[in-house]
UniProtKB/Swiss-Prot annotation:
Keywords: 4Fe-4S, ATP-binding, Bacteriochlorophyll biosynthesis, Chlorophyll biosynthesis, Iron, Iron-sulfur, Metal-binding, Nucleotide-binding, Oxidoreductase, Photosynthesis
Catalytic activity line of the entry: chlorophyllide a + oxidized 2[4Fe-4S]-[ferredoxin] + 2 ADP + 2 phosphate = protochlorophyllide a + reduced 2[4Fe-4S]-[ferredoxin] + 2 ATP + 2 H2O
Sequence similarity: Belongs to the BchN/ChlN family.
The encoding gene: bchN
EC number of this enzyme: 1.3.7.7
Annotated protein name in UniProt: Light-independent protochlorophyllide reductase subunit N
Record flagged with keyword Iron: yes
Gene Ontology terms describing biological process: light-independent bacteriochlorophyll biosynthetic process; photosynthesis, dark reaction
Organism: Rhodopseudomonas palustris (strain ATCC BAA-98 / CGA009)
């Protein structure tokens, strides 16, 4: 249950502690972590993602990526047949054969991820030992790591978290005593370039992004590294970096004008940037983004929105939509709510908003139908049934695939929510 308070003020630190959050643990509707390969294989340009799984796994990744297999993308599936699942063949021998063929055919691969799936975990195939064995065979030319993309008790963005966490032990130790900034979480190249220019203009030096575009250019990490999270779904990665001595900067996430400004300010404050310089550098970008957002307020202002738990972006998105576009939050549900990493976001949410962690899909569907919101953010599996009931939807997975961070993308993010409403209005007219 949620404590309802009159007014729309934001939460204080004391109210955050006392705010009740509904927790649910029933049936869920989510994709598995294999989906993360869709954006990770584009980000790390010399890496290959080899899923050890079933034909269903192969169809999921290929369909989600929208890439024809003859285009030779940087992902593939070592398909487990019935004889593998029945234990009639040595799965390790088969895996060694597939990896050898792959690396002979694709000499451009410098980093190979063996990605576990539900089938490989069911038969207890030890991909960590396989990765170690194959690394010894193919090093130093190819680094081979493993992580799980299984959908057993996970949601789809956890695939990136597992991938990056597996890469943290490979990061070189920091030797420079000067402080460095590590931006953690996959960003579109265009967004990464924008942030790099912004940090340079602010005078924040020694900035690196993780994951990098090339696995041969891994950033260093150590006690002088400050972490700035670009995505909210990376708790295991951040924990692994903190174990290496890095320190996380508390900040909202860079969605919208307010979030981007708070995110940049956290870095600027940590690196001693003069407030006047921060204002000088960011003011033109803020003003331009605010003008662009104003075009969508008439369409989105006052509209009621309901979030099903799917991407773990729900809370930063809700903050952006309520505070910058005047949308009304009916319910904001997220698969996992990391109180520490999302503390700055929770402070900015209206204190009366209904927050839910986890999902019991039938109960949540009932609440959604009773509320009849103007738009629902949900996974693909729920979108079509809700549309058939006359409820406008926005696919949450599209918000992960699309560049939405930073000042320049603020209006693009708003348009993603306005577009379904405009489409519905045209269909009804």
């Amino acid at each position: 249950m949620t404590v309802h308070v009159t007014g729309c003020s934001t939460a204080t630190a004391d109210q955050l502690v006392s705010r009740e959050i509904r927790t649910e643990s029933g049936q869920r509707e989510v994709f598995c972590g294999l989906t993360g390969i869709v954006w990770l294989h584009r980000k790390i340009q010399d890496a290959f993602f080899l899923v050890v799984g079933s034909r269903t796994c192969a169809h999921l990744v290929q369909s989600a990526a929208g890439v024809m297999i003859f285009a030779e993308p940087r992902f593939g599936t070592a398909i487990m047949e019935e004889k593998d699942l029945a234990g009639l063949t040595d799965a390790n021998d088969e895996l060694d054969r597939v990896v050898t063929q792959l690396l002979a055919r694709r000499p451009d691969i410098k980093l190979l991820f063996l990605v576990g799936s539900c089938p490989s975990e069911v038969i207890k195939l030890d991909l960590s030992r396989a990765a170690l064995r194959l690394s010894q065979r193919f090093s130093p030319g190819v680094r081979i790591l493993n992580y799980s993309g299984s959908g057993i008790e996970t949601t789809f963005t956890q695939g990136e978290d597992a991938c990056l966490a597996s890469l943290v032990p490979e990061l070189p130790a920091q030797t420079d005593t000067k402080p460095s900034l590590l931006v953690v979480g996959s960003l579109a190249d265009v967004v990464e370039d924008q942030f790099a220019r912004m940090f340079e203009a602010l005078g924040v030096g020694n900035v690196a992004f993780f994951p990098p575009r090339k696995s041969t250019a891994l950033p260093s990490v150590g006690p002088n590294t400050k972490i700035l999270m670009a995505q909210p779904f990376l708790p295991d990665t951040v924990r692994a970096l903190e174990e290496r001595g890095a320190k996380r900067l508390a900040a909202p996430f860079p969605l919208g004008v307010e979030g981007t400004t708070g995110w940049l300010r956290a870095a600027a404050d940590a690196f001693g940037v003069d407030p006047a310089k921060f204002e000088q550098v960011t003011a033109p970008n803020r003003a331009r983004a605010e003008r662009a957002l104003s075009a969508f307020k008439s369409e989105l202002g006052g509209r009621r929105i309901f979030f099903f738990p799917d991407s773990q972006l729900e809370i930063p998105l809700a903050r952006f939509l309520s505070r910058e576009l005047d949308m009304q939050l009916v319910e904001v549900a997220t698969p996992y709510l990391h109180r520490e990493h999302l503390a700055e976001e929770l402070k900015l949410l209206p204190i009366e908003v209904a927050l839910t962690e986890g999902q019991d899909v039938d109960d949540q569907l009932d609440r959604c139908r009773i509320a009849r919101p103007d738009i629902v953010v949900c996974g693909l599996g729920l979108a079509n049934p809700l549309e058939a009931e006359g409820i406008t939807t926005k696919w949450s997975i599209e918000l992960v695939f699309t560049p939405i961070q930073g000042y320049e993308q603020a209006a693009d993010l708003a348009e993603l929510f306005a577009r379904p409403l405009v489409r519905r209005a045209k269909l009804v007219a």
